């Protein structure tokens, strides 16, 4: 499971797109969940379908590194295009 400290963490690079779905949680409080479904790439350029959510709409055409552990997205952070490994960058 995702709490298993022995389970490896995998990183995938994605270029942000429009959300695939916007879920209204509380319209009065302006609270939404943005769902993203994209192809992510490992540092070696291997592709994988990545599903992740955000509590704010992400800017399009920005680069993220998404961390996955035991088939669960645990985090993501924005990275510069120059920090993306070449094989992943070629696919994005």
Predicted regions and their residues:
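Short extracytoplasmic
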Residues: 5-39
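Structured, soluble extracytoplasmic/luminal domains of envelope-associated proteins
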Residues: 42-92
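Gram-positive cell-envelope targeting signals
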Residues: 1-3
């Amino acid at each position: 499971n995702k709490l298993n400290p022995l389970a490896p963490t995998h990183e995938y690079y994605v270029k942000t797109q429009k959300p695939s779905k916007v879920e209204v949680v509380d319209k009065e409080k302006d609270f939404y969940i943005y769902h993203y479904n994209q192809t992510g790439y490992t540092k070696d350029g291997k592709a994988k379908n990545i599903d992740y959510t955000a509590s704010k709409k992400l800017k399009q055409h920005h680069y993220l590194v998404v961390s996955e552990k035991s088939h669960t997205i645990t985090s993501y952070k924005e990275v510069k295009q120059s920090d993306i490994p070449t094989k992943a960058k070629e696919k994005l």
